[in-house]
């Protein structure tokens, strides 16, 4: 069985769509509220590795929490990014899905989910 950890925000319609898609494909997943329990440091590090060319993709740039900080992500170190993301789960792009503890998938795109999860 494929191990999926799914960090979600209950009020997020994109998260609900992604969860519905996973259920429709009969995937079991561990659901975690990203606001109450942000992703573990090792998962944030994994996301930083995967998105090293554009670290801004890890952030929920449309959210109020991000906009109020007025950040220049390119000027932040990886450690500063980690501390920021751990401090407020609403800063993190969601859903934040960890697949087999080796891959992070940010946001929801049905084609990307199928490509990354089903066809692996």
Give the residues covered by each predicted segment.
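Local sequence-structure signature of Cys/Sec-based thiol-disulfide redox active-site neighborhoods
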Residues: 1-25, 29-34
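Thiol/selenol-based redox catalytic cores and closely related redox-interacting motifs
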Residues: 36-120
């Amino acid at each position: 069985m494929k191990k999926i950890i799914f960090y979600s925000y209950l009020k997020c319609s994109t998260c609900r769509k992604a969860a519905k898609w996973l259920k429709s494909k009969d995937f079991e997943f561990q659901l975690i509220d990203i606001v109450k329990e942000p992703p573990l440091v090792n998962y944030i590090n994994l996301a930083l590795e995967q998105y090293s060319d554009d670290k801004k993709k890890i952030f929920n740039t449309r959210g109020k929490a991000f906009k109020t900080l007025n950040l220049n992500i390119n000027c932040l170190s990886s450690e500063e990014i980690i501390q920021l993301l751990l401090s407020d789960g609403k800063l993190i792009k969601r859903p934040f899905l960890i697949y087999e503890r080796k891959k992070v998938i940010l946001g929801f795109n049905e084609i990307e989910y199928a490509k990354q999860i089903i066809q692996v």
